[in-house]
Structures are given as structure tokens and as C-alpha cells.
Regions:
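Conserved HGGG/HGGXW glycine-rich cap/lid loop of the alpha/beta-hydrolase fold
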Residues: 2-40
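Active-site loop/oxyanion-hole signature of alpha/beta-hydrolase fold enzymes
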Residues: 30-63, 78, 101-109
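Short beta-to-alpha linker loops that shape the active-site pocket of alpha/beta-hydrolase fold enzymes
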Residues: 35-39, 92, 203
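Conserved alpha/beta-hydrolase fold motif
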Residues: 64-65, 86, 171
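Gly/Ala-rich beta-loop-alpha elbow adjacent to hydrolase catalytic centers
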Residues: 65-74
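Flexible "cap/lid" loop of the alpha/beta hydrolase fold
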Residues: 79-122, 155-156, 181
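Conserved alpha/beta-hydrolase catalytic His-Asp/Glu region
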Residues: 119-163
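Conserved serine/cysteine hydrolase catalytic core
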Residues: 151-212, 216
């Protein structure tokens, strides 16, 4: 059985992983959802140490799963934790030749849906429903709205992360994502990661709306 370290995105807290954690446990896996806001951090390196401090000591060669805007942290976290696999869940994939900040400034709508530009779902409930949880049933939606929280330090996109070397990667995308353009994530997964690219009939938060399906994918990752 595998150990999973779950990294929340920029618009949810760690409790957003609760449904997926339950599904992983049914398959005998252990998982921990870290809180990136648990301690102050001024750099990506400090943030990686915040993550490491919350991972149990007996988690060896874990699978690191990061969602959405915290994708740029994956390489550094994987290196620090000596991860066995990286999973990019509807996540931003950094480029070695330019920072994500530079890429976003030069061509924002090549990465993001044009509707998403300028929106903040952490202060606007209709925006949270429309962009993050539009594929949820009512019960799930009510719960999901309670997990919304802003975490968006400016330094997150301002530097180039280290290369992932030979670490296996899997990219999971929602074909109805209203935040990140699926066409961009497909290109980035292939050209920047050489990753296996898997699509789900979901929006931007498949761990919320499709936890069983996400758990099935994670359960089948190579050991």
C-alpha cells in the first residue's frame, strides 16, 4: 500500500481532500493533507519545509499529489520527501525556461479560461460554484463551499523550480475545467513532464466531485 501527501491548491484548505482521503483509506492507503498556511513562509523553500514538518516520519517514498495553483511546488516537495511519484491534479506545470509569473503575464488566456481572469472564488460564492464546483451534487456543493480558502503567496510563481529528473509523473485533468485550459495542461504534461495524461468527466476539483475515480487512478499508479 502507498503513502500519499496531499497538497491543497490556492483556493482551498486541506479539508478539501477529505472525500479523497476516505476513498484512499478504503484501499488500504495512508494519506496526509498538509496545510500550507500552518506556518509563515516567505519563499518556496520555506514552504517546502512547512510541508515536510507535517509529513509523518514513517511515510517513505510517498506519492505527492498537488492541486491547481500549487503545482510549482511539486518538484521541490518531491525532492525533499524523496517521493516515488508526482501527481498533478488539474495543476499548473512550471516551465524550466521561464517562471510561471512570466508565462501568465505574457499569455494569460493560453493557460486560464478567459472567464477566470480576475475572479476570486474565495470571496465570491457564485464564482466558487461556477469555476470550482459546478459538477458537484447539492450535498457535495454545500460541503465544498466550506473548504474554500485563499492561499496565494506571490513568490509561488516567481522562481523556477528544480527539475524532476527521472521521477514518474501523472497528470489528471478535468475535461470541463473552467480554470485551467485543458488544451494547455495536455501540452504542458507532455512537453514539460513527459507525464501520463488522464482525463476525467469533471471540472477543476475532481478530488471533490469525483473522489472515487481519482482514488482509482491513484490506486493503479506503478509501485
Amino acid at each position: 500500500m502507498a503513502d500519499f501527501v496531499l497538497i491543497h491548491g490556492t483556493t482551498q484548505g486541506p479539508n478539501g481532500w477529505n472525500r479523497l482521503i476516505r476513498e484512499l483509506a478504503k484501499n488500504g492507503h495512508r494519506s496526509t493533507a498538509v496545510d500550507l498556511a500552518a506556518a509563515p513562509a516567505k519563499t518556496s523553500g520555506e514552504l517546502v519545509r512547512v510541508v515536510k514538518s507535517q509529513v509523518p516520519d514513517d511515510f517513505h517514498a510517498p506519492v505527492v499529489v498537488a492541486h491547481s495553483g500549487t503545482g510549482p511546488l511539486i518538484p521541490s516537495i518531491c525532492r525533499e520527501l524523496r517521493a516515488s511519484h508526482a501527481v498533478w491534479l488539474a495543476a499548473l506545470v512550471p516551465d524550466r525556461d521561464a517562471t510561471l509569473q512570466q508565462e501568465i503575464e505574457s499569455a494569460p488566456t493560453s493557460i486560464f479560461s478567459h472567464e477566470w481572469i480576475g475572479e476570486n472564488p474565495t470571496t465570491d460564492v457564485p464564482a466558487a460554484i461556477y469555476f470550482l464546483f459546478h459538477d458537484c451534487d447539492l450535498e457535495t456543493l454545500r460541503w465544498a463551499l466550506s473548504t474554500v480558502r485563499l492561499f496565494a503567496p506571490a513568490f509561488l510563481y516567481a522562481s523556477n523550480p528544480p527539475a524532476l529528473a527521472e521521477l514518474p509523473s501523472t497528470y489528471i485533468a478535468g475535461i470541463h475545467d473552467r480554470v485551467i485550459q485543458p488544451s494547455w495542461s495536455r501540452r504542458a504534461a507532455h512537453s514539460r513532464l513527459g507525464a501520463n495524461y488522464i482525463t476525467l468527466d469533471s471540472g477543476h476539483c475532481p478530488h471533490v466531485s469525483r473522489p472515487v475515480e481519482v482514488a482509482m487512478i491513484l490506486n493503479k499508479l506503478p509501485a
